[in-house]
């Protein structure tokens, strides 16, 4: 089963007639890397923001986004924060510390992760950069 499943997602911004997303379906399995490519205004950011309910834009939505079979919108915010990460297009809008290590540790620290576990997870993440 796909970890993230988007099924027939259609989204229309308020005051617009044309949907920004129309009948989008996508499966992403754990460990996969996915690149969304398209012109400016084609809906890439709008789609990604629907993976993180606190960032989802307001408007008319049909379809469903699930994580391991559960609608993302039904997950408690703490679970969403622990399981769903989001890197914005402009890093200046999201960087909160002045050191890469601290930036990688920020989310884990906010969740109360034990120091030893946090160090191991940050080291693991850092190998990708």
Q: Where do the language-model regions lie?
A:
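Pre-Walker A (P-loop) beta-loop-beta motif of ABC nucleotide-binding domains
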Residues: 16, 24-35
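A short, flexible loop at the N-terminus of ABC-type nucleotide-binding domains that lies
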Residues: 1-6, 11-23, 55-58, 74-76, ...
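Conserved ABC ATPase "signature" region
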Residues: 114-129
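Helix-to-loop junction immediately C-terminal to a conserved catalytic motif
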Residues: 52
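Conserved ABC transporter NBD signature motif
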Residues: 60-71, 80
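Short helical segment in ABC ATPase nucleotide-binding domains corresponding to the A-loop/adjacent helical element
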Residues: 85, 92, 98-109, 119, ...
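The feature captures the beta-strand-to-loop junction immediately N-terminal to the Walker
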Residues: 37-40
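ABC ATPase NBD coupling module
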Residues: 71-85, 110, 115
């Amino acid at each position: 089963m796909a970890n993230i499943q988007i099924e027939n997602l259609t989204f229309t911004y308020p005051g617009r007639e044309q949907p920004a997303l129309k009948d989008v379906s996508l499966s992403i399995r754990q460990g996969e890397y996915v690149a969304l490519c398209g012109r400016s205004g084609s809906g890439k950011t709008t789609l990604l923001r629907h993976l993180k309910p606190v960032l989802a834009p307001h408007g008319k939505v049909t379809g469903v986004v699930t994580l391991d079979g559960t609608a993302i919108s039904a997950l408690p915010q703490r679970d969403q924060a622990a399981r769903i990460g989001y890197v914005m297009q402009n890093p200046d809008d999201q960087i909160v510390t002045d050191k890469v290590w601290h930036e990688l540790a920020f989310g884990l620290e906010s969740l109360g992760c034990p120091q030893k576990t946090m160090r191991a997870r940050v080291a693991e993440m850092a190998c990708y950069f």
